[in-house]
From Swiss-Prot:
The lineage of its organism: Eukaryota, Viridiplantae, Streptophyta, Embryophyta, Tracheophyta. GO terms for cellular component: lipid droplet. Transmembrane regions are predicted by sequence analysis tools, but these regions probably constitute hydrophobic domains associated to phospholipids. The proline-knot motif (70-79) may be involved in targeting to lipid bodies. Disruption phenotype: No visible phenotype, but increased sensitivity to exogenous abscisic acid and osmotic stresses. Increased drought tolerance. It comes from Arabidopsis thaliana (Mouse-ear cress). GO terms for molecular function: metal ion binding; plant seed peroxygenase activity. This is Probable peroxygenase 4. Keywords: Calcium, Heme, Iron, Lipid droplet, Metal-binding, Oxidoreductase, Phosphoprotein. The modification Phosphoserine is found at residue 177. SUPFAM superfamilies: EF-hand (SSF47473). Calcium-binding peroxygenase involved in the degradation of storage lipid in oil bodies. May be involved in the interaction between oil bodies and vacuoles during seed germination. Acts as a negative regulator of abscisic acid responses in non-seed tissues. It catalyses: RH + ROOH = ROH + ROH. The gene is PXG4. It is an enzyme of class 1 (oxidoreductase).
Amino acid sequence: MASSISTGVKFVPEEDNFLQRHVAFFDRNKDGIVYPSETFQGFRAIGCGYLLSAVASVFINIGLSSKTRPGKGFSIWFPIEVKNIHLAKHGSDSGVYDKDGRFVASKFEEIFTKHAHTHRDALTNEELKQLLKANKEPNDRKGWLAGYTEWKVLHYLCKDKNGLLHKDTVRAAYDGSLFEKLEKQRSSKTSKKHP
């Protein structure tokens, strides 16, 4: 796949921009641009299978590339510019990221105050379905599908043995720290299997 021209300078997401931090995990070479191959590698690193990783890399990069590259022509490499990821924010979401990609604590808390009825700090699968239904905006199939897919993959990867998706896990997904944790867990499991 394509790689960007290296300037020797690594891209560092803005500290208060949770959306940039979320996406930066997938920027495997830390140059500020995420190519489909990096999206694939990132999904594999957090424990997704080949098929899900391949499908995710195609749909995510095709869907977000042009939105994060305003004023630039079409690229067959479908790069995503991390610094502009806020321009690709989809509808039918929770509102936890504001228009600039910053974390909105009140919207995050609202997820659990409105939808976590069984356990105060966790969502059941049924409560997750209700959250997705509540977030759905009229005539926004693409945004709803994006949100649905994000939440379902998160639930699949991170639910506990009782099927609960915990508040601290969801917050870590929003700021991107969850991905680093999952990658470390996966690599330690792999190293234990192959000493």
